[in-house]
From Swiss-Prot:
The framework of this peptide is described as framework XXIV but this framework name was already attributed to another cysteine pattern (see AC J7JU64). The framework is therefore renamed to the lowest available number, XXVI, and the peptide is consequently renamed RsXXVIA. It comes from the Eukaryota. Contains 4 disulfide bonds. Disulfide bonds: none annotated. This is Omega-conotoxin RsXXVIA. Keywords: Calcium channel impairing toxin, Cleavage on pair of basic residues, Disulfide bond, Ion channel impairing toxin, Neurotoxin, Secreted, Toxin, Voltage-gated calcium channel impairing toxin. It is found in: Secreted. Omega-conotoxins act at presynaptic membranes, they bind and block voltage-gated calcium channels (Cav). This toxin inhibits rat Cav2.2/CACNA1B calcium channels in a dose-dependent manner (EC(50)=2.8 uM), whose effect is partially reversed after washing. In vivo, when injected into mice, it shows both an analgesic effect in acute thermal pain at 30 and 45 minutes post-injection and an anti-nociceptive effect in a formalin chronic pain test. The cysteine framework is XXVI (C-C-C-C-CC-CC). Its main location: secreted. GO terms for cellular component: extracellular region. GO terms for molecular function: calcium channel regulator activity; toxin activity. Expressed by the venom duct.
Length: 40
């Protein structure tokens, strides 16, 4: 996963359910690019 960005992965329903079009990081299994209040 070295040098891989979040945008390299497809969005996950889990991230979408947050209320924003967040990217899902396949490497860490977390959402990234989150700009929603209360979510970091």
């Amino acid at each position: 996963c070295k040098g891989q960005s979040c945008s390299s992965c497809s969005t996950k329903e889990f991230c979408l359910s947050k209320g924003s079009r967040l990217m899902y990081d396949c490497c860490t299994g977390s959402c990234c690019g989150v700009k929603t209040a209360g979510v970091t």
